[in-house]
């Protein structure tokens, strides 16, 4: 036994931080699948089958939100508890959670563990990582707690004290982690998400704010806390906030115009309801996975536009996915510099390094390649779906969004396996999988 433990320890010590991160996520997914496959996890007391359990666990850990069965009507309280725990671990990153336990038992964080935290949080240097992790954990508790408190003002009167509190906590965590899992199937039918609350200001705005805060990233949140004035924020925070709010505003306007008279989506709502629903849908496209209108009923041009926004996704070091807002911002500035024939690429009078530009281009091209490859594969495994439906499900998986227009529950076995792989790739990061990081190696 000692020899086996020693061999495993030696093997782990030889691994790169990125490799350990990938394996760590895979192990958590496997444990989650085993727990969800137990009869105690379902309401009918029967095992769901390992494939669907694995699909759900992958979606939860990768904070995606694509589901094979309705969360509220199929899973028991135990099953729902497992799912939300997996979401919290996946949203914060397993190294952040590991650091939490290390801090609780007052264990010293060594250099190798700091490298793992650095990789998990996508930070440039090692200084202040443990302190940053503490801030992340405290900020998460504060934001999710406040969100749950606000949601409880609606859910407790509607569902009673115990169920209302549980629903508030579940949806606050799911929203902040940009997961998109919901328990509203008992209210408005399976797979209905938050459509019942399309006109509810409290639910819509609270969930939207949680999604935005989870999507802009912890470094930006901490920068906002430290510096009350926008002018004092660092360059990264300014770029993230500007890009995020431009995309949200543009997305809201686009959805409002295209769906304004669609009787199956915005057409039945008053003007205020149209604005609220358009805003929420634009926000949730930032990799959250909730919806307050029927996505399958949206016009094709709206769905195509949503694919673009989902592909862009959230910001670095956040709970969201996608190729990241900073990647798109960097590429736009690069194109602008090329058109104006400028030698340097600048933002806020600061020069963007060539390494950053290359990394952004690499992430973007890998994202496009995964999307095209995924669309082709799923169109072969599930030929009954249209190309637009396939593309929507694939980008939703790769960008860990979780929005669906009806495809996920009806995928074939092969289709589900490939979608799981795309969710996993989207969560651990395409650069982590495909590119080595020689600058991170400590000799």
Predicted segments, located by residue:
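Membrane-proximal intracellular helices of multi-pass ion channels
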Residues: 1-443
């Amino acid at each position: 036994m000692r020899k086996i433990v020693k061999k495993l320890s030696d093997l782990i010590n030889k691994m790169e931080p990125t490799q350990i991160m990938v394996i760590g996520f895979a192990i958590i997914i496997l444990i989650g699948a085993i727990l969800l496959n137990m009869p105690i996890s379902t309401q009918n007391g029967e095992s769901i089958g390992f494939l669907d359990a694995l699909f759900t666990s992958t979606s939860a850990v990768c904070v995606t939100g694509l589901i094979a069965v309705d969360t509220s009507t199929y899973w028991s309280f135990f099953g729902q508890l497992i799912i939300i725990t997996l979401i919290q671990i996946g949203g914060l990153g397993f190294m952040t959670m590991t650091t939490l336990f290390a801090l609780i038992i007052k264990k010293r964080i060594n250099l190798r563990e700091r490298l793992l935290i650095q990789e998990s949080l996508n930070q440039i240097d090692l200084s202040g990582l443990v302190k940053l992790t503490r801030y992340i954990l405290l900020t998460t508790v504060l934001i999710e707690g406040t969100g749950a408190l606000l949601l409880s003002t609606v859910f407790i009167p509607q569902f009673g004290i115990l169920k209302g509190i549980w629903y508030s906590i579940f949806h606050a965590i799911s929203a902040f982690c940009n997961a998109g899992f919901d328990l509203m199937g008992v209210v408005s039918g399976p797979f209905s998400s938050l459509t019942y609350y399309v006109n509810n200001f409290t639910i819509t705005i609270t969930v939207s704010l949680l999604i935005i805060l989870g999507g802009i990233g912890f470094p930006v949140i901490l920068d906002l806390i430290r510096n009350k004035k926008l002018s004092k924020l660092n360059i990264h925070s300014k770029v993230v906030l500007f890009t995020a709010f431009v995309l949200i505003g543009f997305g809201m306007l686009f959805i409002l115009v295209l769906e304004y008279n669609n009787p199956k989506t915005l057409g039945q709502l008053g003007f205020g309801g149209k604005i609220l629903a358009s805003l929420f849908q634009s926000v949730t496209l930032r990799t959250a996975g909730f919806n307050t209108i029927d996505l399958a009923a949206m016009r094709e041009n709206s769905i195509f536009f949503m694919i673009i926004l989902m592909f862009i996704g959230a910001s670095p070091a956040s709970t969201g996915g996608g190729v990241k807002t900073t990647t798109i911002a960097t590429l736009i500035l690069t194109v602008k510099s090329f058109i104006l024939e400028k030698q340097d690429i600048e933002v806020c009078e600061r020069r963007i390094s060539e390494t950053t530009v290359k990394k952004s281009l690499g992430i973007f091209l890998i994202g496009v390649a995964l999307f095209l490859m995924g669309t082709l594969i799923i169109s072969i495994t599930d030929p009954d779906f249209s190309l637009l439906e396939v593309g929507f499900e694939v980008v939703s998986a790769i960008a860990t969004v979780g929005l669906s227009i009806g495809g996920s529950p009806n995928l074939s076995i092969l289709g589900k396996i490939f979608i799981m792989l795309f969710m996993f790739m989207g969560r651990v990061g395409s650069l982590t999988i495909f590119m080595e990081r020689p600058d991170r190696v400590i000799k």
